[in-house]
Structure formats: structure tokens, C-alpha cells
Amino acid sequence: MAPPLNVVLVNSKSDEPFNDEHRRLIAKISPLCYAYNYHLVLVNFRIDDSPTDFAREMATSTSIGKGGERLIELAKKGKIKITKLPLSEDLGKIVICTSKPDKTKSENPKNIFALSKKRKIALIFGCDKKRNKNIRNLLQKADYHLDISCKGIQLSVDAEMGAVTSIINNLE
């Protein structure tokens, strides 16, 4: 059995209150995590609730993922973690998903898939395209960088999350 794969959503602005943009992004990624049996890790969001309480609160404000039911089910299965930076080593090998990979850390989807079968990995996505100190530190400390387009094409965060999770899930 392959180790768990973590989808990590990072809010680069730790002082920013939880907002509708965050809510929509989390609502969009939760059905993907549910469908592919991935864990969801929310980093640097101002969330004080337990994962289950947070999921229940979110469910009332979304129609995505069967009205938030997928998010609640992930939480009940222990597949949602709410944490802060720096990232915990127990998330596994860090893979930054970016259209601007460092050439020395750049990997292709097939190699990331192969790694995911042997080791726990964390696919890191930023909530926005800003590269502040928090994101620069993550880029520097990451084990690998993944440009899912393999062409340096910048995608919206939700499109990138969908592409990365689907491609990694469907490779063999």
C-alpha cells in the first residue's frame, strides 16, 4: 500500500483573516482529496476550530462536494490537518507545485508519482501567486519543484490543484 499523499494549501499571509476566497479554494480541493484518497493540510489559515468543526461550519456555506459533505467525511476520517508554518517533517518529501521551478529541484509528474508510491509526499500549493518570505522559504527548503504544465505556464490555483492531483492519481 502506498504511503499517504498530502495536498497542502498554504496561506502565505499569516496575518490575513480567513475569507471567502480561502473558503472557495478549500471547497474546491476537498472533493479531489476525497476522490483520490488524499489528505488535506491547511497551513497558516486563521482557523481555531478542530478539523471536524471547521468542516461542519464550511459545509453550510458551499454547494461544492455534495454541499460540503466530502469535506466533513475527510475530517471524520482524520484526513484534514490544520497547522502553521514551518511545515512538519511528518508531511513527507516536500513538492512545491509552481510554474517557475528551480531547475536544480525540478521533477516531472512521472517521477513524483513514482516517489509517491515509496514515500510520503506533500504537494504544496500557495493560495495566491505572491512570493513573500514564507513562500520563498518553502521554495528553498522544498525537496522538489513540479511544473505540471512542463512548459512554465501559470495556471489558476484551483486549476493547478485539479491537474496535479488528477495526473498524479492516474499515472501508472
What are these model-predicted stretches?
Residues 53-62, 110, 134-139:
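Short, aromatic/basic amphipathic alpha-helical patches
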Residues 37, 91-92, 119, 139-142:
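Short, well-ordered alpha-helix to beta-strand connector turns
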Residues 22-28, 106-110, 161:
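Well-ordered, non-membrane alpha-helical segments in soluble/globular domains
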Residues 98-138:
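Long, charge-patterned amphipathic alpha-helical coiled-coil/hairpin "stalk" segments used as oligomerization
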Residues 13-16, 47-50, 101-104, 128-132, ...:
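Short acidic, S/G/P-rich loop/turn micro-motifs used as interaction or catalytic elements
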Residues 133-172:
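Structured adenosyl-cofactor binding patch, chiefly the S-adenosyl-L-methionine
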Residues 2-99, 169:
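RNA substrate-binding interface of SAM-dependent RNA methyltransferases
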Residues 1-4, 112-113, 117-118, 172:
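Short, Lys/Arg-enriched, disordered terminal segments
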